């Protein structure tokens, strides 16, 4: 069956979503067209609004429609003197659900990967270093995904913190090697935060 060029374009757009292959994209496209069209229109409007209005927090780089996100604007969180470094804004959601952290964050939007040409500047490390040198930070918690690149990124940041005399800790057991933080259940992640361990290079 020859498919409409408009439907083909819709399916191709849906395939850009993570985990969506050709069959899933076709299923989603036909579902949107077969169901109440108002739902699809609302989805399109919400997507357009998010794409045009959501930017990055000037302090932590998470997604927000404000110059500074609610967490970074919270004076109580600032006084805690803690920064939790994560790879993605979705990791913030996962950690917030545990209720075990009340400091502020820094989002890398990735991780160091020299083979892919991703260096310190590409993941915002100059901005993080500026915060380390200007804010009264007592502890940096490294909550990167347990991958080779994540470990390399953690070590790089830990050494950077050491230059400023700032303690660094790393979330502990329970997060599987090669896994994504956002996929870890709340209880496991909570234990990993509570059981975080210092990073030493001596």
Curated annotation (Swiss-Prot):
Zinc finger (C4-type): 57-72
GO molecular function terms noted in the UniProt entry: DNA binding; zinc ion binding
The Toprim domain, residue ranges: 81-176
Residue ranges crossing the lipid bilayer per the database entry: none
Biological process terms in GO annotation: DNA recombination; DNA repair
Keywords: DNA damage, DNA recombination, DNA repair, Metal-binding, Zinc, Zinc-finger
Entries under PANTHER family matching the protein: RECOMBINATION PROTEIN RECR (PTHR30446:SF0)
Family: Belongs to the RecR family.
Its biological purpose: May play a role in DNA repair. It seems to be involved in an RecBC-independent recombinational process of DNA repair. It may act with RecF and RecO.
Name the record gives this protein: Recombination protein RecR
Organism: Hamiltonella defensa subsp. Acyrthosiphon pisum (strain 5AT)
Gene assigned in the entry: recR
């Amino acid at each position: 069956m020859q498919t409409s060029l408009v439907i083909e374009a819709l399916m191709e757009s849906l395939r850009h979503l993570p985990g969506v292959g050709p069959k899933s994209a076709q299923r989603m496209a036909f579902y949107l067209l077969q169901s109440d069209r108002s739902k699809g229109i609302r989805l399109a409007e919400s997507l357009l609004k998010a794409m045009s209005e959501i930017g990055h927090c000037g302090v932590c780089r998470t997604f927000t429609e404000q110059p500074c996100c609610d967490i970074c604007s919270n004076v109580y969180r600032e006084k805690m003197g803690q920064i939790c470094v994560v790879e993605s804004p979705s990791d913030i959601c996962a950690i917030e659900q545990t209720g075990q952290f009340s400091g502020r964050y820094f989002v890398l939007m990735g991780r160091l990967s020299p083979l892919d040409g991703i260096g310190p500047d590409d993941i915002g490390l100059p901005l993080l270093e500026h915060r380390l040198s200007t804010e009264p930070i007592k502890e940096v918690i490294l909550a990167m995904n347990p991958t080779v690149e994540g470990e390399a990124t953690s070590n790089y940041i830990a050494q950077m913190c050491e230059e400023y005399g700032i303690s660094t800790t790393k979330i502990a057991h329970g997060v599987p090697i090669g896994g994504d933080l956002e996929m870890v259940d709340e209880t496991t992640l909570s234990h990993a935060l509570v059981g975080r361990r210092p990073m030493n290079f001596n």
